[in-house]
From Swiss-Prot:
The lineage of its organism: Bacteria, Pseudomonadati, Pseudomonadota, Betaproteobacteria, Burkholderiales. PANTHER family: FMN-DEPENDENT NADH-AZOREDUCTASE 1, FMN-DEPENDENT NADH:QUINONE OXIDOREDUCTASE. The keyword NAD applies. This is FMN-dependent NADH:quinone oxidoreductase. Binds 1 FMN per subunit. It holds the Pfam family Flavodoxin_2. FMN binds at residues 10, 16-18. Its EC number is 1.6.5.-, 1.7.1.17. Keywords: Flavoprotein, FMN, NAD, Oxidoreductase. One of its GO terms (molecular function) is FMN binding. Quinone reductase that provides resistance to thiol-specific stress caused by electrophilic quinones. Belongs to the azoreductase type 1 family. Its cofactor is FMN.
Amino acid sequence: MSKLLHIDSSILGSNSVSRQLTAQIVASWRAAHPATEVSYLDLAMDSPSHLSVESLGFRLPAGTADLSEVQQRENAISEALVSQFMAADVLVIGAPLYNFSIPSQLKAWIDRVAQAGRTFKYTEKGPVGLAGGKTIIVASARGGMYSTSDAGNAMEHQESYLKTVFGFFGVTDVRFVRAEGLAMGEAAKAAALAAAQVEILAQTHSAANQPQAVLVA
């Protein structure tokens, strides 16, 4: 049985396109894999705090002096999040574009799971990812058009960032279901959502037909 972690990060609730897309992606995945165990994380409702002196305990070397009660509590949050991430075979992540990047809540989650010795390690030859073997499907929602021009691509630090950071963790199978131009009129929005539906079927069917050994780390 594979484990799927469903993550939403949009602050728009029921008005969110990325939430709509992640729900559809998960439904399509479960249709192909009915026995999949699904966990859900809503970062807009339950976001870890941004990194601070109090939440950096997991980065301290062994033998460091006893941590404060607050540091221990923050460490427990980081440990729960990185363990949940590492246990997942498939992740479906809603990542709307906010001000050319991702929501700060999603960045806070990434900062908690980016742990040396857990999701990556440093070697004499450079960093090595430790979270390989996963499939990650990102629901990307954008008000404008960024993928159709060099200027737009240069402004986009959403999909490119996620591909980079998950690649750093060792994840090579990162897929995107994109709906862009959502704020450019009703016709453009309808076309974007229709294209996303086609992409959902293509991406979940493609991922679902990988060998099970690839899907189960």
